Amino acid sequence: MINEQELQQLVETISLESFGRPFLHQAKINRRLKTTGGRYQLSDHHLEFNPLFLKEENLHYLPGIIKHELVHYHLHLAGLGYQHKDRDFKLLLKKVGGSRYAPRLEESKRSRWHYRCRQCGQDYWRQRQ
């Protein structure tokens, strides 16, 4: 698993190589991210990444995810359309070869709870993360 310093260096390198522009903010690991590969913060321009994609077995997904978040970053700072629906976003994402979606990873054990109504016998399943 790579640490935050290595992540910062990787983001800075990919930004220069793929976009020709420096990344001047922070790249962080956010353990609360579960269903997405990363997130661009509009308020402070920092990038956050899901730690599942920083594990050795998932590192091959990371450059595509970093490029995706950097597309948001560079377009927003340039005053262009940075949202997924915007044409500018779609064109730049395709140009740099970023991931459109983060792949779904096998998560650590999830609990499934089974409930049965005592009156009617109806079964209910609850899945906890």
Predicted regions and their residues:
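Walker B catalytic acidic pair
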Residues: 69
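Active-site-proximal or metal-binding-adjacent scaffold patches in catalytic folds
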Residues: 1-64, 73-129
